[in-house]
Amino acid sequence: MKKIHLITTFAFLIFIFTTLYLSLDTRKIYNTEDIIGKKIDTVELTLFDNSKTFNTKEISNYKFTLFNFWASWCAPCRKEHKNLIKLSKNKNLKIIGVNFKDNKTQAKEFLQEMGDPFFILIKDPKGKQSVNFGVYGIPETILVNQDLEILKKYIGPLDLKDVNEIKKIVTQ
């Protein structure tokens, strides 16, 4: 009887852990298709160093822009960072980093340690600007064309499949 109870408990725990593991893939949960084709709002964003502001309409000067919402305390952001470095080498793409609810010193240290893929770095200490972009967690990444039209939104860390998809889009 004790053996049956132990096996039942073990099977139940395996079921629970499997369910939790499968639920971690948030890309399947959130539908990002409804924002594809919409234009981002024209807003003023404060640069990370407080030197001036950046107006989103300025991205019309670039063929493609990738907005990446990140923080130094975010483990998945650390995981995707090497992929942002790869993408930053593409001449058709400018990456704008939006530092989300982060400590400025720690954010600087993160970029010194991991490399800085950002053409422009924005600060968002309260997360307000990120919410205006429809971002509710990090990392999230939004690919925009020069008409300010959203081409793709990625929820979670960019992986190699995402990098290849972005490269394909920006080299067409």
Predicted regions and their residues:
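Short pre-active-site segment immediately N-terminal to redox-active cysteine/selenocysteine motifs
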Residues: K63-T65, F69-W73, G137
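A short beta-strand-turn-helix
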Residues: E44-T65
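Conserved redox-active cysteine motifs that mediate thiol-disulfide chemistry
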Residues: F69-K86
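Conserved segment of the thioredoxin-like fold in thiol-based oxidoreductases
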Residues: K89-N90, K94-K126, I138
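Thiol/disulfide oxidoreductase modules built on the thioredoxin-like
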Residues: Q112-P117, D124-T171
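N-terminal targeting signals for export/organelle localization
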Residues: M1-T46
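Hydrophobic beta-strand anchors of alpha/beta hydrolase catalytic cores
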Residues: L66-F67, I95, T141
